[in-house]
């Protein structure tokens, strides 16, 4: 089947394709979902009043003059099942998520007391995380059974953020982790 959703006034959507097939004791299913957006020119105005120790008020105004926001996400899952209703169950599932938010930015006009200048913020983010899950069950006798399960996961994240309102501030993250969990009962 399919489920498609798109906005008419903005670049925004969420679309899904899925299916399932059965044959004998086996079943194969999949799903794929993609969603994303792109907005340009969103603006906000901010005014902050600070009361100083001498009782005077100090005002800073931040007004957006230019901006771009965009992001896309993909999620996919593939599952295989085999089942003998009297004794055995096997299931293998592979799913993954990929997210990308490239080069978003905002440019602001700053009025800081008597000074006026521009400030820029930039951000980008990318991550993906595949997961493999395997399950097995076998009834050996009416009182004995074996169950086994294993899950393997990998996560990768890359993030970069930059802001300059007079003094630049930047940080980057590049993180990766993997795990394997299993049990037999």
Which residues does each predicted region cover?
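A generic short-segment signal for beta-strand/edge and adjacent turn/coil regions
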Residues: 57-61, 114-117, 179
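Membrane-proximal, glycine/serine-rich, low-complexity loop/turn segments characteristic
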Residues: 1-107, 121-156, 185
């Amino acid at each position: 089947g399919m489920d498609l959703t798109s906005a008419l006034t903005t670049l925004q959507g969420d679309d899904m394709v899925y299916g399932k097939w059965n044959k004998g004791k086996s079943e194969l299913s999949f799903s794929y979902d993609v969603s994303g957006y792109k907005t340009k020119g969103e603006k906000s105005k901010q005014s902050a009043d600070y009361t100083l120790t001498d009782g005077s008020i100090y005002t800073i105004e931040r007004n957006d003059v230019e901006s771009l926001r965009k992001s896309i996400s993909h999620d996919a899952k593939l599952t295989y099942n085999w089942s003998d209703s009297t004794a055995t169950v096997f299931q293998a599932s592979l799913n993954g998520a990929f997210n990308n938010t490239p080069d978003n930015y905002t440019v602001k006009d700053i009025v800081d007391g008597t000074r006026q200048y521009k400030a820029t913020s930039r951000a980008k983010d990318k991550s993906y995380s595949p997961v493999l899950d395997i399950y097995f069950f076998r009834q050996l006798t009416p009182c004995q059974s074996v169950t086994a399960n294993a899950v393997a996961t990998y996560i990768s994240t890359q993030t970069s953020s930059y802001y300059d309102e007079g003094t630049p501030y930047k940080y980057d993250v590049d993180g990766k982790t993997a795990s394997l969990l299993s049990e037999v009962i």
